[in-house]
Amino acid sequence: VPMKNSDASAVESASSKIYVGVCIDTACTLGVCAERNAIFNMITNGEDAIRRVFAVNWKGEAIPPCGACREFMAQLMPEDYRSIEIMMDQEKERVVTLGNLTPEWWL
């Protein structure tokens, strides 16, 4: 059952198309984060390269991807994941790369 106040995400693909997703939380922890949901949407539409990720909580504040989402992006783009841009603070326009968040990934 989705939470009433849920996170949402937008992913910009390498082709500059925007894909969106929402967080689907369940009582049994088998939910899917908004970022992965947006990436699944991108993959469903035939794309496999991420340029930027932007996620917000129910208050509209930018939030970083969780460890599972970081792992998924790294596995999806093992050669290029370090270049994916992540919005950390929209008011201050602070952007970091996934490589900054995960500098010594195991891949």
Ranges and model annotations:
Residues 33, 37, 68-71:
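Short amphipathic alpha-helical face segments that pack within enzyme cores
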Residues 1-12, 17:
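Short beta-strand scaffold segments in enzyme catalytic cores
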Residues 22-36:
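Compact, glycine-rich, soluble single-domain proteins
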Residues 4, 23, 61-64:
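Disulfide-bonded cysteine motifs in exported proteins
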Residues 41-47:
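Alpha-helix C-terminal capping segments
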Residues 47-107:
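C-terminal binding/interaction regions
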